[in-house]
Amino acid sequence: MTTAADSTRRRATAGGDAADRVVLFDMDGVVLDGWGTDSAVHARALDDVLDERGLAVTGDRRRSLESDSYDDGFRDACAALGVDPAALFRDREERSAKRSIERLAAGTRRLCPDVDAIDAVAERVPVGLVSNNYHPTVEFVVDHFRLDAFSFVRGRDLGPEGFRRRKPDPHYLDEALDALGARGGLYVGDRATDVIAAERAGLDGVFLRREHNAALDLGVEPGAEIGSLHELIGLVDAGSSDGAVRPGADGTGDRSR
């Protein structure tokens, strides 16, 4: 069986010297338009797994099970139904991933119009894609839209463990840096959790402000704020001139731990 780790290794750069610096990208709202997967996908996925088990759930209990969080409310609802919460959560996420892929294949979401900038960045440094979205969904997006510039692709694992490793936990960013042999660089995202995860991984967080998050009060200080992926090219070129890929001059982009 092919695991997520196997998949990321296949996409990692093969051979050659290790890359000192990289630029990593979030997916939803950065590469793919919109905040993320429609909540209706999770609702229909829940219907799938409840129907399989012959369960009918309504009201507050159903709302707890529809949540994308593996929290006390979800576990309490499962306990009341007499089902294993971890198993139900993973099954629901498998169905959510399947349904989200079907919607993407049907054309419900498109690439952001400035993604061509990623190819230009990739000519300068290795680039990777690291998302809180499900790993099967992230891989589908890369293959479906032929995003061949990425040397590393990682979404989160399905199930409770993958949920716990979501950003702002830096787990998957650390995995990307290790796979690419990188010490530092940039992580481009569209929310505060992206900036926090970047800092925890020893990267500079670049906040991308688009229409969907135009009014967002970030609440944290990013290394840089941009309004288009095309602005990254200048950041990378400026950073490369002094041996680091970073928007600031404080040295925080170096990953030395």
Predicted regions and their residues:
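Asp-based, Mg2+/Mn2+-dependent phosphohydrolase catalytic module
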Residues: 1-16, 135, 139-257
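N-terminal helical cap/lid subdomain that shapes the substrate entry/recognition surface
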Residues: 3-116, 123
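Hydrophobic "anchor" residues on beta-strands that sit immediately upstream
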Residues: 22-24, 128, 186, 224
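Short, surface-exposed loop/turn motifs that are enriched in glycine and acidic residues
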Residues: 104-107, 127-128, 162-166
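Anion (oxyanion) recognition and catalysis
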Residues: 121-122, 199
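A short helix->loop->beta-strand "cap" motif at the edges of active sites that frequently abuts
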Residues: 123-126, 203
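Conserved phosphate-coupling serine/threonine residues in phosphotransfer and NTP-handling enzymes
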Residues: 131
